[in-house]
Amino acid sequence: MPTAQRAPAALLVRRGGDKLLFDCAEGTQRQLLRSSVGLLELEEVFVTHFHADHVLGLPGMFKTFALRGRELPLRVYGPRGLVDLLGSLKRVVGKLTYDLQLVEVEPGDVLDRDGYRLATFGVAHGVSALGWSLIEATRPGRFDVAAADTLGVPSGPERGALQRGEHVVLPDGRAVKPEDVLGPPRPGRKLVITGDTAPSVEIVEAAWGADVLVTEATFAEEERDRAEETNHQTATQAAEVAQRANVGLLVLTHLSNRYFGPEIAEEARAIFPETIVPRDFDVVEVPYAERGTPHLVKGGASRRREQEVVSSAPQ
């Protein structure tokens, strides 16, 4: 449930120029408008399940896009039942100015993208529901300038080709392979989003080794019975999942309105210290492993923060 300080479920992932919205609760479009992201650049929405606190923002957003004259297609992915659910809202939304594409997916499906893939997995919530993993492709190793100099690889296109994993032939006829000048391959980043769920082996398997696991902690441990009755999990259970999955950072969301956040974070950190409970408009930066660890940027997506950064820049 929303509170005066916290909006319900919606998470935006930005990777390069891609903006991926996971779930869209009531008020999501207003939150986006208040952020540094905005609405019109959204191209894809990924739904975890169809409970009202995860999808009620979709009809209003569809209508707003149309009123703004959007022409760019919008794709919405979700579990089985997506087409029936959103198709039934045509009378509410009215005529659209763009192509709305509804795509149903099953646990185990994979959507390939440029440089990464989105893999779905089953979660335990008592309804048709799934989680999402964003998994980047392995990257070439670091370019060894000294090795390239020793081999006589000239500066320019040849070095660029080797960095892209391509073989090159030098002017004297010698062939140079990428592995001659590149270090070991470097893993990409991995982000896992569960949506609402009870703890399960499937989540541990899907989240194994992830840089970031975003999962729910609807209840504190004292309410474990309530969590089990409603197919949710406690902060303690979420921390145990993160520990078993060997993730880098645990991000807890979907708190009951009886909690403010710090008490949930404290409970989880007793088991898994690398835990945060972000607020609206907070950002979790996920650098490549060689550049650091995932970390919280408070208010990093707020338009106010963006304006402050611009106004403080040297003129």
Predicted regions and their residues:
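Conserved beta-strand hairpin/beta-sheet module of binuclear metal-dependent hydrolase folds
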Residues: 1-37, 71-73, 132-134, 141, ...
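Metal-dependent phosphodiesterase/nuclease catalytic metal-binding core
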Residues: 12, 106-252, 259-271, 287-314
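Short, surface-exposed connector motifs at secondary-structure boundaries
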Residues: 16, 41-42, 68-73, 244-251
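Active-site neighborhood of phospho(di)ester-bond hydrolases with catalytic His/Asp-centered motifs
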Residues: 22-25, 42-50, 79, 192-197, ...
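Active-site metal-binding motif and surrounding structural segment of the metallo-beta-lactamase
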Residues: 26-77, 101-104
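Metal-dependent catalytic neighborhoods of phosphoester/phosphodiester hydrolases
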Residues: 57-65, 89, 260-269
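Active-site neighborhood of divalent metal-dependent phosphoester bond hydrolases
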Residues: 70-106
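Generic structural signal for residues in well-ordered beta-strands
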Residues: 99-102, 118, 275
